[in-house]
Design a protein with these regions (language model features):
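Cleavable N-terminal signal peptides
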Residues: 15-17, 27
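Sec/Tat signal peptide C-region and signal peptidase I cleavage site
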Residues: 23-29
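Short, exposed beta-strand-loop hairpins at the edges of beta-sheets
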Residues: 100-124
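Short, solvent-exposed mixed-charge patches
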Residues: 128-129
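Bacterial N-terminal signal peptides that target proteins for export
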Residues: 2-15
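Central antiparallel beta-sheet cores of small beta-barrel/beta-sandwich binding domains
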Residues: 32-100
Length: 129
């Protein structure tokens, strides 16, 4: 009886130890779907699924002079390129130029959006809006 109890306890102990030590190796996947705010302008952008790809459009602006930008699709058809990362064309709604865009989730409440031309990139971390 004691041997069975000890054996059972040992098995549980080993199982618990293995599961706890495996935790640091687990990667958390976050997705960008929802509304995010660009801190530099107060613009809110909704990221949504479009035929299995990532799209984004402007849904609100802080500056009334930018009101005409509401509804502008700034990203269409971005594909998942790595865990927590999507790549696709990114429209700068202010100047009409298209850049290579990279969306990277930095956690459940932080999205980094980066636009690149050749090897020059600029990015900004956005918060949930």
């Amino acid at each position: 009886m004691i041997t069975n109890r000890c054996s059972s306890l040992l098995t549980r102990s080993v199982a618990l130890t293995l599961s706890v030590t495996a935790l640091p190796g687990i990667a958390c996947a976050f997705d960008p779907y929802g509304t995010w705010m660009r801190p530099s302008t107060g613009t809110q952008v909704n990221f949504y699924d479009c035929a299995g790809k990532l799209c984004a459009k402007i849904v609100a602006v802080k500056d009334e002079r930018r009101k005409s930008k509401i509804g502008t699709v700034i990203m269409a058809g971005a594909i998942k390129s790595a865990d927590n990362q999507w790549k696709g064309d990114l429209l700068n709604a202010d100047d009409g130029k298209v850049y290579t865009g990279v969306v990277t989730m930095q956690g459940p409440n932080a999205l980094n959006l980066k636009g690149c031309v050749a090897f020059v990139c600029q990015g900004e971390t956005w918060t949930e809006g």
